[in-house]
Amino acid sequence: MTKPGERDCVMSTDTVTSALIVIGEEILSGRTRDENISHIARYLNDIGIVLQEVRVVRDVEAEIVAAVNELRARYSYVLTTGGIGPTHDDVTTDAIAAAFGVEVAIDPRAVEAMRQGYSELELTPARLRMARIPLGAELVDNPVSRAPGFMLGNVIVMAGIPRIMQVMLDAVGPRLRKGRPMLSRSVRIDAPEGDVATGLARVQSAHPDVQIGSYPFFENKRLGTYVVLRSIDEAKLEAAQDALWILINKKGFAAASADDK
């Protein structure tokens, strides 16, 4: 498993970082399984933004405000999912406004967007809650259900429904500052993690600009280990992988590339 400090070893001063806040009692209660984290992580990685932290918070305005203010000061971007629907417990919009010290109002741009999906009779007061946007925010398009997300400062607010979140992420992605994509290599070793650990620590020590993580698995009644190497520098990544293969061959472990996993 990744040791403390390994994450920092692959970062540079021009790295673009991010955090994700998952908002919703239904996630914390186990009633709903989050399906957004892995999609967001992969999307951000592909455009050179490193996701460094994920938090799950309740639909409580004060708790959302605290998390947003802490994380937006620490990371290049903060993304949120959930809590921008039409019901009383959808408090994310108000929380983001409170975090930035701005007012919330019905946004004519949001209303116009929603008119493309709803008739005037269907634009009930409940649905118009989804047109409430913090002052100064940019809208994030939602071609699926029309009610937009928004971006205020370095905070991007999206829906929690996976399909809607995905189109919002596609819409906002081109606006974000890009970094160097994180590259990775994976190797499957048919040996327990404990047999690999000492040598793996030596490889990590010799290659501080590469993050090396080990992940045990149990298959066909046997223990094994996936080793994942990550870096923004391809040459350093390849050098670390070469060192890993030298270790594997020296120990006589059965192993194979797992980059398609």
Feature locations, PLM:
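An accessory alpha-helical subdomain
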Residues: 154-247
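Short coil/turn connectors at secondary-structure junctions
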Residues: 15-18, 74-75, 134-136, 146-147, ...
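Glycine-rich phosphate/diphosphate-binding loop of Rossmann-like nucleotide-binding domains
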Residues: 12-54, 58-59, 238
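N-terminal small/polar loop signature for handling phosphorylated ligands or for N-terminal nucleophile
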Residues: 38-91, 96-98
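Short, Lys/Arg-enriched N-terminal segments with co-localized hydrophobic residues
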Residues: 2-10
